């Protein structure tokens, strides 16, 4: 079969710093697929992950841990693709691979480009057959699930019977982290952005309770549920919600800092913490990154896969279809429009 000569790609049109990111910051256009050269691979995109951390690479500020996206290259994120043609050792036509994939229907990547993308750790990994659902590789068996695993097992280290309050609980990381914490014997209270999401947490995932963080009585709601406060706060959002939770915690207690999605549009660099609750409650604040546990990643993925297979972890996905939906899928994370992991499928024949 002849290789495609035209493709569509989604580009960032301008940076957004100190203002909300919108669909107007992206454009999708058709262009030629250049001829394959030595040490390059031609990929058909099957599925793309959209993740909050990508927002930091759309600000124009060079203080983030991944480089800023440029306007002359498509945006990229973790994705799954099929090899259509290859002049790169180790990859054959028909291979299905996981890595940092362009927001394109079809793309050409060089070995240098693959190695230079920290989103994927500079790797393009061949997936073994038979394939699991593609959302698993981008969610619970990908960076999302690994972040949740090491956030709980490595950083939180919950003791049986401890109570954990978890923000962003209906998101990709939060929904997995809460289930892992329960498997380790913790009581989990989830915070989510709507009554419907709270119902998903309690009825589908088995959380002990869930609260709507938008409630004007959140402090009272937390204290009514936990008069002595939680032992652990697993923070995915930062901002005012986190300050509220910290003001209700027992003495002493632990705060595990995983993400600050509420602050990603802040030009000053994020959440400025009021340390008074930390001081008054004797809180221990700890941050982590899944990269700190790189040598243990394979074991974490194997354990997560086992938990899925035996029904101990339920996967939640919000699925979009087609390249043109990628910006909306990404922005919906910040609008509260997703439940669980957000994935865009570009090939209708795969799931």
Annotate each PLM feature.
Residues 98, 165, 211, 233-234:
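N-terminal Rossmann-like NAD(P) cofactor-binding module of classical short-chain dehydrogenase/reductase
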Residues 138-216:
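Mid-domain Rossmann-like dinucleotide-binding core that forms the NAD(H)/NADP(H) cofactor-binding site
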